[in-house]
């Protein structure tokens, strides 16, 4: 598989050599000749910013450049007509772009390795997990169907080591993984990723990295917008959504409703040794989900406050593994989740003050009391409460015209509560609560010389918990050269931790699994180095990661009056990664990209690295190849993904599952009818109808078809 990646990269480089390019350097000023900083200069595929003196440098092969900054009229100029000076005309600010500060560091100096995932507004994603897995560093082993549980892994780390942050609020700081299917993809505005040991920014569970999700708050201009969409697909799938947005100069309101229903009863091939040349149907697998999301934002000069709330209810049939269908038949999980956030941002002295208050409530009920073969009867109700307050202050200080010092400080306090009520045996009830507090300090020294930008920063964090107190840190450095070839090199070094979840500590709900109250927190230390190059419309990037994890928690089968599963601190694990990315957009209507991730994840607690066994369910190789064709009304896209073999037992003695490849295809068409934007869309998933395995006795779906239409109308 390496050969096609190398061949494609060489082909991209060869063709790009023939492209005509322009190296443009100029200064941006207002009509009074004052320099304008932080202007966004874009050629459609690449973006740069003007520095504090108004200067910018860009290498482009496009015909035009667009200049945009809040408080000024947007300007578009031909590259042949751009001289040494660009004048922007001021205009009153009607609606500033609404941002929610995740933590203090995001106010003044985001990490240099933060990556923004592209979200196609015309593409229809079946879950938030699908949005994230478009990045090769993010992988999911869950069934890729609407309504199914969706957990993700960053750089081969465990899913519980991926911290999900929603509008600044961590959703899984308790050491568990987060189910992304509980987030409505129609309500996602943007996604940012920070990889490799970032507990200093998010706290527990950020060993692998952080995924920061921002929800939609409103339009980028005043007016009203109404949209409705409906979609049908394979396996009894149907989804309907409706949204309304109201924007005024000082008030923004948005509401989104969504309903999903699917049977997910797909046909799969039975293993050859079980029943040769036969198939079966994955039945008893229906999923239903309803969601409501609303947000309100009020603007007052340079400050604003906002409130967001989401409510989601769901019901899932859980058929279990196909070798125990009669034991889990009619089993189900139902429940609801409610998330609320209040955010206030305001200028203070020469900096910015941010306040965030949140309340998250979750409740689920598991019922396995109606199985024909009542071996593992279980019926329990879980409740989770997470509340807290976060305050932050950030300030930018100019030491010299070229040198700036950015400082930020934040503090947080909150409360967690977890209850598990066993409805068959109240003696097995679990009641767990804890308080937490933390503080973060970050400083950044940044030098902007016009032709290059050099940034060095450090952050420290101290967490107070009722289990253990944790100290984490992170060092960051990056150097960006803005010459004919735009080059960026950088690296980070840091530590992280992950608390054992209440489930790991106290579970006692059945005879097959038992919690371990003696578990220790997991700790890690790791580094990463990266280099990226942008030349014309060609983009190349490579990155190297290493992470050592101590006290890694894994569930193992032990002998305790019979076989019992119990979580244990197995010792030490080491995860190494090599990332390679390439992208090329030779014309505005064609976008090509490819990527590869090589992972070496091993349990080194008892062996040296060479002889150590691989960690389970972590593919050693991931490749992707994507193509987009964009015309005025029609868009076509394809997404090919290959995932390598995975070991399924800790000792690696069982033959690993082989690698598999998937191809997804889609199209969107847009047209205006009587003032309405009508957009039919169609998607084919697993277009090659591949049969593959990720977990034993958990079948994966074959080819699936989805299609629908969205209607949208806007009024000024």
Locate the predicted segments by residue.
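Short acidic/polar hinge/loop motifs at secondary-structure boundaries
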Residues: 56, 169-197
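A beta-strand signature from Gram-negative outer-membrane beta-barrel systems
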Residues: 86, 185-227
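Periplasmic-side early beta-strands and strand-to-turn transitions of outer-membrane beta-barrels
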Residues: 71, 247-333
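Extracytoplasmic beta-strand/coil segments of soluble accessory domains associated
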Residues: 129-170
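Short strand-turn segments of transmembrane beta-barrel domains in outer membranes
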Residues: 216-246, 257, 279-285
């Amino acid at each position: 598989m390496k050969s096609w990646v190398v061949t494609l990269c060489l082909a991209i480089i060869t063709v790009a050599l023939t492209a005509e390019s322009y190296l443009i350097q100029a200064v941006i000023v207002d009509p009074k000749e004052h320099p304008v900083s932080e202007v966004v200069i874009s050629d459609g595929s690449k973006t740069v910013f003007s520095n504090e003196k108004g200067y910018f440098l860009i290498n482009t092969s496009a015909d035009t450049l667009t200049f945009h900054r809040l408080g000024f009229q947007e300007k578009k100029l031909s590259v042949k007509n751009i001289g040494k000076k660009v004048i922007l005309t001021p205009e009153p600010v009607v609606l500033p772009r609404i941002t929610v500060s995740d933590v203090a560091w995001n106010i003044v100096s985001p990490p240099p390795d933060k990556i923004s995932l592209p979200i196609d507004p015309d593409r229809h994603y079946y879950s938030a997990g699908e949005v994230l897995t478009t990045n090769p560093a993010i992988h999911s082993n869950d069934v890729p169907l609407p309504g199914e549980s969706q957990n993700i892994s960053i750089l081969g780390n465990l899913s519980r080591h991926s911290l999900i942050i929603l509008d600044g609020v961590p959703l899984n700081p308790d050491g568990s993984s987060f189910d992304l299917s509980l987030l409505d993809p129609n309500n996602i505005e943007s996604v940012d990723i920070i990889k490799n040991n970032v507990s200093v920014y998010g706290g527990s569970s950020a060993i692998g990295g952080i995924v920061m999700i921002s929800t939609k708050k409103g339009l980028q201009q005043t007016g009203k917008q109404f949209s409705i969409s409906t979609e049908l697909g394979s396996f009894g799938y149907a989804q309907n959504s409706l949204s309304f947005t109201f924007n005024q100069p000082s008030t923004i309101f948005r509401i989104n409703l969504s309903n999903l229903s699917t049977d997910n009863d797909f046909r799969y091939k039975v293993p050859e040794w079980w029943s040769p040349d036969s198939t079966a149907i994955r039945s008893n697998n229906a999923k239903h989900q309803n969601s409501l999301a609303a947000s309100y934002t009020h603007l007052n000069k340079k400050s604003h406050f906002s409130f967001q709330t989401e409510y989601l209810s769901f019901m899932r049939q859980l058929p279990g593994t196909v070798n125990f269908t009669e034991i889990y038949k009619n089993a189900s999980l139902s429940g609801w989740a409610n998330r609320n956030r209040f955010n206030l941002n305001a200028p203070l002295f020469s900096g910015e003050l941010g306040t965030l208050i949140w309340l998250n409530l979750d409740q689920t009920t598991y019922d396995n009391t109606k199985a024909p073969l009542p071996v593992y009867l279980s019926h329990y109700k879980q409740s989770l409460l997470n509340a807290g307050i976060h305050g932050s202050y950030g300030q930018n200080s100019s030491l010299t015209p070229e040198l700036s010092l950015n400082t930020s400080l934040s503090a947080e306090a909150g409360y967690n509560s977890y209850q598990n009520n066993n409805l068959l045996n109240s003696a097995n009830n679990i009641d767990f609560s804890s308080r937490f507090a933390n503080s973060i300090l970050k400083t950044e020294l940044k030098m902007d010389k016009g032709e290059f930008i050099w940034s060095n920063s450090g952050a420290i964090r101290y967490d107070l918990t009722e289990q253990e107190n944790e100290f984490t840190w992170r060092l960051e450095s990056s150097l960006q050269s803005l010459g004919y070839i735009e080059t960026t090199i950088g690296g980070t070094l840091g530590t992280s931790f992950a608390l054992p979840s209440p489930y790991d500590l106290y579970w006692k709900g059945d005879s097959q699994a038992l919690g371990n109250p003696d578990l220790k927190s997991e700790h890690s230390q790791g580094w990463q180095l990266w280099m990226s190059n942008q030349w014309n419309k060609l983009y190349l990037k490579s990155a190297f990661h290493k992470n050592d994890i101590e006290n890694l928690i894994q569930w193992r089968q032990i002998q305790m009056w019979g076989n019992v599963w119990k979580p244990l601190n197995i010792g030490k694990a080491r995860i190494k990664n090599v990332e390679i990315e390439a992208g090329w957009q030779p014309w505005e209507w064609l976008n090509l990209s490819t990527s590869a991730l090589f992972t070496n994840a091993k349990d080194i607690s008892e062996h040296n690295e060479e002889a150590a066994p691989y960690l389970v369910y972590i593919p050693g190789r991931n490749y992707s190849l994507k193509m987009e064709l964009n015309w005025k009304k029609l868009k076509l896209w394809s997404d090919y993904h290959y995932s390598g073999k995975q070991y399924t037992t800790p000792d690696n003695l069982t033959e690993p599952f082989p690698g598999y490849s998937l191809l997804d295809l889609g199209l969107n068409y847009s047209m205006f009818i009587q003032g309405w934007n009508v957009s039919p869309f169609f998607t084919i998933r697993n277009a090659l109808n591949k049969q593959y395995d990720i977990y034993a006795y958990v079948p994966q779906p074959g080819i699936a078809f989805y299609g629908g239409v969205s209607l949208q109308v806007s009024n000024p």
